Amino acid sequence: AKAWTESADYTVGNLETTLNGPPYSGYPQFCAPDALAYNLKSIGFDLVTTANNHCMDKGYNGLSRTLDVLDQAELKHVGTYRTQAEFDENHGVVVADVGGISVAFLGYTYGTNGIPVAADKDFSLNRFNVDYTGDCATLDQEKLSSELAYAESLNTDLIAVMIHWGIEYQTTQNAYQEQVADFLISHGADVILGSHSHVPQPMGTRTVTLDDGSTRTGFVAYSLGNFVSNQSPATVNVNYTDTTAILRLELTKNGQTQETTVTDVSYVPMLVLNRGTGVQDQYLILDVNALIAAHDSGDTSVATDAVYSKLEYALNGCHTILGANYDKAGTPPQTTSA
């Protein structure tokens, strides 16, 4: 995966855990070692959204310490905040230079697994539902429209929203995701990057009609699946929990009109493989196309016959769900560091 994540002008992802120090824990309340932040930085990640349903797993202190660790690792973050002043500094917006194009990033979650945010810490988490501890079905239009208006006031070239939404283990988006996407696009979002389902969901352009009759179009990736996790059909009995993709978006700014658009979309099909021996798990994030080609040319050092069948299943899943037409990234670029 590093060849792809390191070569991009800007790499973003969803950090769905806390970094609260030992003792570490898995499901249902996550806490990972601090090394994860440094590892992500070392393979080229530039920004993570920390707004998801697990960000409150260790309470406000866990949320706060997670951001401290990310700062120490020099990994930018969006979606959660330690103080009111930290939120007010940029109104929940992080502006990044992406290959000479300015992009405003915002991060939101549907909820927190029922864990409430204390009244005096309301600033700490960006959520897009009013009922974020309940049904999670009432859009906070006032909050979203206000923060997107602020993002627009910055006059960046593009606005990207990273959002935790949808239903776990569903390979299609639901009507509420589409409703939220339409609201975001109509209020200025150009790109929407979704997560939460733990399996891939469709991607593509979406056009909305505004109140004045004009239209506005944005690109939506409803979910890319698990970039790395211990989930697989064998562990959770759900297909495609080990299937993911690295999304690559090409942004182009017109020198005459100054308009910036997404001019190319592609993805890299990936498979998360546990090569553990039973004593210790060892997870690899495999480039599906590259290893299928290696196996076909006689190199079975990684792509054994057993692994090959998993690669084919992952490729079929990506093509069926994400669209075969977007699988055109080609061979991985050369990495620049060890």
Where is each model-derived feature located?
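Acidic, metal/ion-coordinating pockets
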Residues: 1-338
